[in-house]
Amino acid sequence: MSRAPKLSLNLQFPAGKAWPEHKSLLPKATVAAWIKAALFADAELTVRFVDADEGRTLNRTYRGKDYATNVLTFAYAESEDDPVTGDLILCCPVVEKEANEQGKPLGAHYAHLLVHGTLHAQGYDHEDEDEAEEMEAIETEVLGKLGFPDPYE
């Protein structure tokens, strides 16, 4: 029987920003459980929750897109043999807006985006239809095991 992957996790919320509803849904143990469910190898990850200004700046700087997006993943492993290391950046206002528009509980949407970002940190992508189908299938399976419905329905 294989052992569960180990996770070293650092959570960051922006200083001086009040995100009480978000923070209450995101205790470290909960975030760690969601991420671990999507890990296939040991990992060191930082998850930073940001406001729209920081989200937009990061998306513009690193992706050339001048808007805040829901999740950005910065994966630092240079080869498959390297440990999984990375930063997941979640933009709180965008996550909340999407959850409301999609009629999803905020916690369920955070779980989905954390699983999604964790898969990116491990090299998964959705640049073409086959990659997207594979990634969505893994996300749906992982979220189901965590008790969440299919995020794509």
From Swiss-Prot:
Domain of life: Bacteria
SUPFAM superfamilies: Metalloproteases ('zincins'), catalytic domain
Enzyme class: hydrolase
Cofactor: how bound: Binds 1 zinc ion.
Compartments it resides in: Cytoplasm
Gene Ontology MF term list: metalloendopeptidase activity; RNA endonuclease activity; zinc ion binding
Family as reported in the entry's similarity comment: Belongs to the endoribonuclease YbeY family.
Annotated protein name in UniProt: Endoribonuclease YbeY
Gene: ybeY
